[in-house]
Amino acid sequence: MAADKPHMNLAVIGHIDHGKSTLVGRLMYEAGAVPAHIIEKYKEEAKQKGKESFAFAWVMDSLKEERERGITIDIAHKRFDTPKYYFTVVDCPGHRDFVKNMITGASQADAAILVVAAPDGVMAQTKEHIFLSRTLGINQLIIAINKMDAVEYSEAKYKEVVEQVSGLLKMIGFKPANIPFIPTSAFMGDNITKLSEKTPWYKGPVIMQALDELKEPEKPSTLPLRIPVEDAYTISGIGTVPVGRVETGVMKKGDKVIFMPGGAGGEVKSIEMHHEEIPQAYPGDNIGWNVRGIGKNDVRRGDVCGHTDNPPKVADEFVGQIVVLQHPSAITAGYTPVFHAHTSQIACQLISLDKKLDPKTGQVKEEHPTFIKAGDAAIVTIKPTKPMVIEPVKEIPQLGRFAIRDMGMTIAAGMCMSVKQK
């Protein structure tokens, strides 16, 4: 049923407890993505408990339970259809360390819904998520101003939050005029599939409509092949099977490929998606593939697969443009935090701070600053402590973005401007 519809990866972002999971649950429930036998089971329980929102409650319980067990939900549970697209929710993070997922998850997102609770307005993570989504190249946003029921559907409160969020968006180059701000109550179901009588003052699109009005992402199939490895399995009778998402390019059965930085390579014997063999894989496909002559020790998470004649770049050092989101003191040359780029996590040293920039305009404020701090943007030279694949963002945007983590938080986000190869 989904093959004929274009596919979109959707990130649902925002501050903890602002209603991200409830919104995902509501979207799935309204889109009919809850299996019938589950609905039946809950109908029985709901009858006994006198609750009517049984199926919705089921979605919420399963999301909550999966979150508490610390596992991500099976992909089948996290997909839903709108008239035009079918969506996969790539991440619905709830924890401080969600950023890790956001870097690996949001870099795969074509669009994001930012959930901001009306009673609270903009909070610390709201800011962090907006910055990160921009850095990670998400340029389509929908803003859900949620929990409107908690502010009695007040238009004044809605306008106040719109104002706050617009200010942030402008600061990093989004145009708020092109972004829908939708007053919602995910829990009550207001303005999700149809306009709510409780917000007669709101005339814009509802969430489902806004999702359908997103632009279809361009498939970067003409770029060189790049598949960051998420994991590698050993399957009896087949051998080593790396799995990952095709970011750019096309891989066909019989192609000669290489895994960098290790350098092992061979011929593609088979490609599988959703447990079915396919002749070729395109950007956005989550696949497993088997390469002749590749053993268990030749490939690991963080490696990148490409064609032998155009292999992924391995950086001896690289120049990055970064925005410092938060840091308790100041950052100087010599700082060695962990860089998260595609599926790799590698400690890298900032060997020089080259320029300090105005984060709004990108103009140079200072050459060779002695330090940079939260709120600063900068151009820096970076040396990975071990071999690492990264590409200039102008050449392969999907492999040019990174986040810098330290002390359990995202210190900075950035993009690679140029690579000095090993």
From Swiss-Prot:
GO terms for molecular function: GTP binding; GTPase activity; translation elongation factor activity. Residues 185-187 are annotated as: G5. Residues 91-94 are annotated as: G3. One of its GO terms (cellular component) is cytoplasm. Pfam families: GTP-eEF1A_C, GTP_EFTU, GTP_EFTU_D2. GTP binds at residues 14-21, 91-95, 146-149. This is Elongation factor 1-alpha. Residues 5-221 form the tr-type G domain. Coiled coil: none annotated. It catalyses: GTP + H2O = GDP + phosphate + H(+). It is an enzyme of class 3 (hydrolase). NCBIfam families: EF-1_alpha (TIGR00483), PRK12317.1 (NF008969), small_GTP (TIGR00231). Its EC number is 3.6.5.3. Residues 14-21 are annotated as: G1. CDD domains: EF1_alpha, EF1_alpha_II, EF1_alpha_III. It is found in: Cytoplasm. Belongs to the TRAFAC class translation factor GTPase superfamily. Classic translation factor GTPase family. EF-Tu/EF-1A subfamily. InterPro entries: EFTu-like_2, G_TR_CS, GTP-eEF1A_C, P-loop_NTPase, Small_GTP-bd, T_Tr_GTP-bd_dom, TRAFAC_GTPase_members, Transl_B-barrel_sf. Residues 146-149 are annotated as: G4. GTP hydrolase that promotes the GTP-dependent binding of aminoacyl-tRNA to the A-site of ribosomes during protein biosynthesis. It comes from the Archaea.
